[in-house]
Design a protein with these regions (language model features):
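A generic N-terminal leader/anchor concept
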Residues: 1-53
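Short, conserved acidic/polar surface loops in the N-terminal third of protein domains
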Residues: 59-62, 82-86, 143-146
Length: 356
């Protein structure tokens, strides 16, 4: 279990100094999110842990992105309220009533806010919250595993609890469905809220998960299962539209809005704002250009039934004799000199599209 001192301002300041990351508010949110996760496990709630915080635990030191929400999948019919009664034992002061809603898309979800007293302020009224998102459906992952809740943001007073998560290949397939803002993914807007950061978080995670897989067999199976469900929720009947969405969104980033379909200004806003969620490293448009090339390559491999991946070997010279096939815009050739890794994946993507 998480030590009680981890919920103090002093602890958050220590973590901030150790990680060279100064946003104490987000550090505390990570601690509180992991405490909520422990509560769900101790309650006996039947769930699979997914989303950004699961990716953070799964990748460990291979990712520097902070995640502060808890996303889980529960079997249909689960009464989540039964498992939330011990919230005060885990440092929370109150819960907003669980809200079950399917906002026009027939998605069986609920949302709960777990409130806590802020450690980094002396104001009695200083309050923060952690969001619990629950999706009620069968698990569509090919492989799952149990991993310990271990993080540089917490210390434990006993053996870590284990949580059930998708495999890296599975969660990569899941994340890919979410990076399609015009179809199955996080949209550019939810009502009046701009979702720029949420979209770029998916892109960031996709690239780092891809770095950890050797082939796309599991990813492809996971993607096809999950995207089928997401399409049904949204009344989409054309899988090619989803593949095109991922491709066009990636082109939009690669060409800085000159080509592609979507809203580059929103994507650019997300690229700027995601910096506040990343510690010990930076993130800007140059990184997003490389990451979007990986997303395009992964989705095109799945689209064409290719599971063996040809990863960039790290030597820029390899791209000297490569070119972008006519299946994609020639503007991508401009990446060759400055972004050889991005160019490599775009050249491979264009080959796959041209050959089929």
């Amino acid at each position: 279990m998480i030590k009680s001192e981890c919920f103090t301002r002093q602890w958050c300041e220590q973590v901030a100094q150790r990680l060279n990351y100064n946003d104490i508010q987000l550090i505390e949110k990570v601690v509180r999110a992991l405490s909520l996760l422990e509560m769900l496990i101790k309650s006996g709630c039947p769930f699979h842990f997914k989303g950004g915080t699961a990716t953070m635990l799964l990748l460990g030191g291979a990712t520097n992105r902070l995640s502060i929400d808890i996303d889980i999948i529960c079997p249909p019919g689960t009464e989540i309220e039964r498992y939330l009664s011990d919230f005060k034992d885990f440092g929370f002061t109150k819960i907003d009533l669980v809200e079950r809603k399917s906002p026009g898309k027939n998605i069986p979800k609920s949302h709960s806010k777990f409130f806590y007293q802020l450690a980094y302020t002396d104001r009695v009224s200083g309050e923060g919250y952690i969001l619990l998102d629950v999706l009620y459906e069968d698990c569509h992952y090919q492989n799952t595993l149990e991993i310990p809740i271990v993080s540089p943001f917490i210390e434990l007073d006993s053996e870590p609890l284990n949580v059930k998560v998708p495999s890296i290949g599975d969660i990569l397939g899941d994340k890919l469905t979410a990076f399609a803002p015009n179809t199955t993914g996080i949209p550019y807007y939810k009502k009046e809220k701009v979702c720029s950061v949420e979209i770029i978080k998916q892109l960031y995670d996709i690239a780092r998960l891809f770095d950890r897989v050797d082939n796309l067999e599991i990813t492809a199976q996971s993607f096809r299962r999950i995207v089928t469900v997401e399409m049904a929720y949204r009344d989409i009947d054309n899988l090619e539209a989803v593949f095109d969405d991922i491709l066009q969104t990636s082109i939009l980033i690669a060409t800085r809005g000159k080509e592609g379909v979507g809203q580059f200004d929103i994507l650019q806003d997300g690229i700027k704002k995601i910096k506040s969620f990343i510690h010990t490293s930076n993130y800007h448009i140059d990184h997003a250009i490389v990451d979007s090339a990986k997303a395009a390559y992964i989705s095109t491999c799945i689209r064409k039934g290719v599971t063996a991946v040809e990863k960039y070997p790290g030597t820029p010279e390899i791209v000297l004799d490569m070119s972008i096939a006519p299946a994609l815009t020639g503007k991508l050739n401009k990446l060759k000199r400055i972004f050889p890794e991005a160019f490599y994946y775009w050249a491979k993507t264009s080959e796959l599209l041209q050959d089929n």
